[in-house]
Amino acid sequence: MPSKNASSTASLDTSSKEPTVDPATCTHQYEEKVTRKPRVLDVGEKTFTCKFCNTSYIEEIAKTNTIKILAVGNSLTSNATQYLWEIITSAGVPKENVTIGRLFLPGCSIAWHWSNIEDFKEDYDYSKNTNGSWLTQQNFSVQAALEDEEWDYIIIQETIASVTNPTAYSHLGDLILYLMTAEPEAELAWQLIWTYQAETTSQWCKFKTPAETEEHFGKIVSTYKSQVQHWSQIDHLIPAGTAVQNLRSSYIGDTITSDGIHVNDKHGMYITALTWYAALAGGDLEAVTWLPSRYPDLADDLPVIRQSVKDAMKEPFVITQQAK
């Protein structure tokens, strides 16, 4: 991880705890705790609290210099990261300071990832973006991808086929422990995925009505709460699925996938990458200026896309109605 140097600027505060020593006469001995981790576009904070009188003060932690993200997933993580490099760099992060990596195995679940790790399987396509283009290598293992960079963030998710099945998460603890051991300085994140598109002729179409898709998304959320949320080692939630559901409630409608499940390369890949940016980079959504060159008209929809992401970050477990 990049160096996280605290600034010298401090602001005084008084703890709500009952002091055991008069702060005016106390010979302070402060204990330090990071209360907000810095990100590439957002400063962090350290809180120093006196163990005798509970007086505290806050110091700012400088932004990190680089951001390196590794997604261990399947086609939905590939969808969500397709535009991520462009979005982060357009917000002002130097291009040479952004690295996006992803391990791709179609339909790969948490249990399957864990089995591949145990058996040192080299079954993945490993794609990496350091300059705006994806370079893909085949026959890669999870171990090799972890060793390729000193990753700042590692993202995991469950596959759509088993995302609502509680038994599918039986090896989540094993996977978390392995990743933390392999990359102890990295922060873990979980992508909350989206559900199927309704009323399509696609082979992926599981539901006939929007009400059925909303019900399924509710099950995705409830399963996350029961099977994932209690893992304190997961530092971040990326509510990409919530952002997609929010956008589906807008005038754009349920037209965001290319085949009933994989998001399309217009609204779909854009809103999911923007959600990753919001969750991991910490920058303002309005600072993102990049648009896919083949979709200049996407600029007209940026207000509702941004609002869908903002609402997802604020209320990740609730579908927020957008402008019709």
Regions found by a protein language model. Name each.
Residues 62-92, 291, 314-323:
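N-terminal module-boundary/linker segments of secreted carbohydrate-active enzymes
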Residues 70-72, 103, 191:
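Short hydrophobic segments within beta-strands
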Residues 138-266, 278, 287:
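Alpha-helical cap/lid subdomain in secreted, periplasmic
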Residues 2-21, 324:
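Viral virion structural and adsorption modules
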Residues 13, 17-63:
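Extracellular modular ligand-binding repeats in secreted and cell-surface proteins
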Residues 78-171:
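Conserved SGNH/GDSL esterase-like catalytic core that processes O-acyl groups on lipids
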Residues 39, 107-111, 243-248:
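A short acidic, often aromatic-flanked loop/helix-cap motif at beta-alpha or helix-coil junctions
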Residues 65, 256, 260-263, 267-324:
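Conserved catalytic region of serine esterases and O-acyltransferases that act on ester linkages
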